[in-house]
């Protein structure tokens, strides 16, 4: 493990040189004026004011982190001279999560988009606007998750099993980001609009708001490891949930088979990543207080609700905004239960088509049809692979 001094040096370098730090310090007044699609000046001004508000909210949330935290007391974080070798496995539950992630590997080339363009051209303008902007958010968000994994979690966590998972998660987030980029490249033929969507963090205040919240946790020097685990569980478990649900709504209508299949694969992966965050939280000795956890989750819920009911309302594709807001609260409650906090919203799932989707911190989705898409034998016991002559034919 690197010394504490080296970690401090690395964090100082991050604060000066990281691309995410540059994004965080950009003034929202410098958001470029765009005239593409539905981005009218009035809406842009409205969203910009909202972004300014969340910037202050996120910063104030960071400043509230005053709970003493000693990394040397945490088995996950203390120096581990055996971190360069994998065996013998010390944390079998963490290792099994890594093997499950490894078994679920897939590539962009395995998703067939040949039938999507026909549906794309049949969609209404509002529907195309909504889908393209959701894809723009996704394309940027996976890069932000990786920024956190590379700059913070992978450097802080010292147990080999967790490092294996984070390494594989980084690879899968790259696949997700590539998938969303390919989808945008396939559906959007206008090069100027493509550029606008690929730069969503700078061009779309609604996306910037969510990005700034996540990035502020990466760059924070006051938030402890436990709080940041909660924040990124919220990013992958709450920030993605409504957008996943909106794309599954299209599947319910029999539209865009390539988009909806990739959404199944990615939502399964993100469900597993959220599960892993919960598992890491359970291994912590110094956990954030219940009130602090609720505060972080409530903040994430408010941002996601605003995103899909105001900035990019789901009624553009025929969904009910009130039900979407309720669904986000339902997802947050399921995450809070996994964290041992208990429900605070007590809302039911309003979308029956989402019953089996792993956005709630559970891995049951991994077991259903799309979850069977896994590498053969990766999660099985090697001792089960025995040659025999007494098999029935």
From Swiss-Prot:
Pfam families: Ribonuc_red_sm (PF00268). It catalyses: a 2'-deoxyribonucleoside 5'-diphosphate + [thioredoxin]-disulfide + H2O = a ribonucleoside 5'-diphosphate + [thioredoxin]-dithiol. Fe cation 2 binds at residues 173, 236, 270, 273. Fe cation 1 binds at residues 142, 173, 176. Its cofactor is Fe cation. The modification Phosphoserine is found at residue 18. Binds 2 iron ions per subunit. Gene3D superfamilies: Ribonucleotide Reductase, subunit A (1.10.620.20). It comes from the Eukaryota. It is an enzyme of class 1 (oxidoreductase). InterPro entries: Ferritin-like_SF, RNR-like, RNR_small, RNR_small_AS, RNR_small_fam. Keywords: Cytoplasm, Deoxyribonucleotide synthesis, Iron, Metal-binding, Oxidoreductase, Phosphoprotein. One of its GO terms (cellular component) is cytosol. Its EC number is 1.17.4.1. One of its GO terms (biological process) is deoxyribonucleotide biosynthetic process. CDD domains: RNRR2 (cd01049). PROSITE patterns: RIBORED_SMALL (PS00368). It is found in: Cytoplasm. The active site is at residue 180. SUPFAM superfamilies: Ferritin-like. Provides the precursors necessary for DNA synthesis. Catalyzes the biosynthesis of deoxyribonucleotides from the corresponding ribonucleotides. Heterodimer of a large and a small subunit. Belongs to the ribonucleoside diphosphate reductase small chain family. PANTHER family: RIBONUCLEOSIDE-DIPHOSPHATE REDUCTASE SMALL CHAIN, RIBONUCLEOSIDE-DIPHOSPHATE REDUCTASE SUBUNIT M2. This is Ribonucleoside-diphosphate reductase subunit M2. The gene is RnrS.
